[in-house]
A protein has these predicted regions:
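Short alpha-helix in the alpha/beta-hydrolase fold that links the catalytic acid
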Residues: 46-47, 160-170
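A domain-start/cap signature at the N-terminus of enzymes
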Residues: 1-30, 64, 107, 112, ...
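Short beta-strand/loop motif that positions the catalytic acidic residue
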Residues: 149-152, 156
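Gly/Ser-rich "nucleophile elbow"/oxyanion-hole loop immediately N-terminal to the catalytic nucleophile
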Residues: 26, 72-109
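A conserved short beta-strand
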Residues: 123-134
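Short beta-strand immediately N-terminal to the catalytic nucleophile in serine-hydrolase-like folds
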Residues: 104-106, 131, 151
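Histidine-bearing beta->alpha loop at or near hydrolase active sites
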Residues: 153, 183-190
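Active-site machinery of serine-nucleophile hydrolases
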Residues: 30, 34-83
């Protein structure tokens, strides 16, 4: 089943979002998918171009509830973290999702958004899978209690694989559990589709359960 709704945030930003779920969705995890820059706007059909929504459009079903919001055209996910959190909170309540089974993934701009959202709300997620993304390396300490499985094509010239390499290495240096899965011979869009279609990325996300909900301070919080 699929529901498409519109959310108006507390600061009056409008965002469309889809929720795909099986008939019996009791006790299932929530997977949040953040799309890339080319799928922004108000035409929700654009969201189905890549990643998990593309698989949903093709008829694939998952043993999970899938939330896939659409970023407004004038923003990027890194600017929409608070608004995204409002939608996640709504879906968790609406579908009675257990808070230890919420996971996050995204590709390209959504890969960056995955890193950023997880660093803003690490206590919210049981695990993350950024695909062809990157972020702010000095903030990776926020992820030390969160499993990270990153994916990136080694022929990606849109977002170089070095972006994922730096984030994974920084997370590990802070004591986190992070790994980079290199998609050999693949570029940007084809690498993204390969990660979701031909690897066990989704199955691994479904297997994650959160056990540590403690607050992790920013580096600057520890200094003052």
């Amino acid at each position: 089943m699929l529901n498409v709704k519109t959310h108006i945030s507390n600061d009056e930003k409008t965002m469309n979002f889809g929720v795909a779920f099986p008939n019996d969705y009791n006790d299932l995890p929530l997977i949040i998918y953040l799309h890339g820059a080319g799928e922004r706007g108000k035409n929700f059909e654009h969201v189905y171009r890549h990643g998990i929504p593309k698989l949903i459009k093709e008829g694939k079903e998952f043993n999970a509830i899938i939330l896939f919001p659409q970023c407004p055209a004038q923003f990027i996910w890194n600017n929409m973290v608070k608004e995204l959190k409002e939608i996640i909170d709504f879906v968790i309540k609406e579908y009675k999702i257990k808070k230890d089974r919420v996971v996050l993934t995204g590709s390209s701009m959504g890969g960056y958004g995955t890193w950023e959202t997880a660093m803003c709300y690490p206590e919210l997620f049981a695990g993350i899978a950024p695909v062809a993304g990157g972020g702010v390396v000095w903030r990776c300490g926020k992820l030390k209690n969160l499993p990270v499985i990153a994916y990136h094509g080694d022929k990606d010239f849109t977002v170089p694989i070095s972006q994922s390499e730096c984030m994974v290495e920084s997370t590990k240096n802070f004591g986190g559990n992070a790994e980079l899965n290199v998609i050999s011979g693949y570029g940007h869009n084809d690498g993204i589709d390969y990660a979701y279609r031909n690897t066990n990325l989704i199955e691994r996300l479904i297997s994650f359960r959160k056990t540590n909900f403690e607050h992790v301070p920013e580096v600057c919080e520890e200094l003052f």
